[in-house]
């Protein structure tokens, strides 16, 4: 209670909190933690640190077993910030603050959102709690339960190729069910929880040039969805992976983590190529049970302009306007060699559909994959 001793957490409080984590394990129930405290009661010395350590261990043990939601309603300081950030979803009130070791920097909800720490920022504490309730209502109780199913009405918006990522997601998913996470952070990726045909799904839209932040944003979300067997629907319009600050080796490592997240996921995975899928992006996002493409998609190992230089360079020799011809040849390459029809011949695409039919195709595909089961080689986890 922030009104009593600044909400300082004592050893007795910590033991009380740890008991709730134990109950969540025994009952397979989601855990919602509300933070509004100025930190630990430091006068208790090492004892309070040991108690906090028990809570952090319990939170780690609970990860992937039941959904954990952190609601930052006020101050969230020090080890409490560590605990909040270990949750699956962090919801912050607009006037709340979160920092670990130094209060001199920007600890506002806006800063946490910009840094990708806060998944959702709400107007006030009451709205944050309401959002946590909504999350609990759409997520499975635990990793052995299925997500709630409800009647899903189609959105009134028509699917169009030129739509913004979040608008396309809203048009395909059930009306008024899209809950975007980490909005405004790493804009090359849009992630959301929603329902399609009444069932909860995780939706990813990858666009532009995927960089370190967007790849990590997607990878973390895919792992979260896989933990609770939520199907993952991925829309792809990626021109390739960009170098991170000019360090090409770092880009390769981060891209490999993204590819691993998709490869490791055993939940139902559907990929829809709505635009470009160039190079490693086509491979990483293409690790799915069903790969669908719109007719105008471009799926290629190289960008069309680069491919023209490699494969059709002879056609450029002696051209009066080489730049213009290069553009024309790149367009031709995209429509022929890099078309989804060629990808289908190479077994990289299972179905090519009219964009207007995207929602109905996804509903059918999700029904088909509902009973998917995968056995893995025995191991603790990927290294």
What are these regions (language model features)?
Residues 1-383:
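Ligand-binding clefts of soluble mixed alpha/beta catalytic domains
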């Amino acid at each position: 209670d922030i009104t009593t001793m600044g909400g300082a957490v004592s050893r007795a409080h910590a033991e009380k909190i740890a008991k709730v984590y134990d109950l969540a394990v025994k009952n397979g129930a989601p855990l919602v933690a509300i933070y509004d405290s100025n930190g630990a009661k430091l006068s208790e010395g090492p004892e309070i640190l040991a108690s906090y350590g028990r809570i952090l261990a319990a939170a780690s043990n609970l990860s992937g077993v039941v959904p954990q939601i952190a609601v930052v309603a006020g101050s969230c300081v020090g080890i409490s910030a560590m605990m909040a950030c270990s949750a699956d979803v962090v919801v912050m009130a607009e006037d709340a603050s979160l920092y670990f070791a130094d209060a001199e920097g920007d600890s506002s909800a806006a800063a946490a959102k910009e840094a990708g720490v806060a998944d959702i920022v709400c107007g006030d504490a009451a709205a944050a709690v309401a959002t946590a309730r909504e999350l609990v209502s759409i997520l499975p109780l635990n990793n052995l339960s299925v997500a709630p199913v409800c009647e899903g009405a189609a959105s009134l918006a028509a699917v169009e190729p030129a739509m913004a990522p979040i608008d396309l997601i809203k048009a395909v998913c059930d009306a008024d069910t899209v809950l975007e996470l980490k909005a405004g952070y790493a804009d090359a990726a849009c992630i959301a929880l929603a329902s399609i045909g009444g069932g909860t799904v995780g939706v990813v839209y990858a666009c532009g040039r995927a960089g370190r932040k967007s790849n990590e944003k997607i990878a973390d979300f895919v792992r979260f969805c896989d933990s609770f067997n939520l199907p993952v629907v991925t829309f792809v319009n990626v021109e390739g992976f960009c170098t991170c600050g000019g360090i090409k080796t770092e880009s390769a490592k981060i891209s490999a983590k993204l590819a691993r997240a998709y490869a490791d996921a055993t939940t139902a995975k559907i990929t829809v190529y709505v635009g470009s899928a160039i190079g490693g992006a086509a491979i990483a996002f293409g690790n799915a049970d069903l790969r669908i493409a719109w007719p105008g998609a471009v799926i290629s190992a190289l960008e069309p302009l680069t491919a023209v230089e490699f494969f059709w360079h002879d056609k450029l020799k002696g051209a009066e306007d080489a730049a213009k011809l290069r553009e024309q040849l790149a367009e031709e390459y995209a429509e022929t060699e890099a078309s989804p029809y060629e990808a289908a011949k190479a077994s990289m695409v299972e179905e090519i559909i009219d964009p207007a039919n995207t929602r109905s195709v996804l509903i059918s595909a999700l029904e088909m994959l509902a009973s998917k089961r995968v056995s893995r080689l025995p191991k603790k986890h990927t290294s």
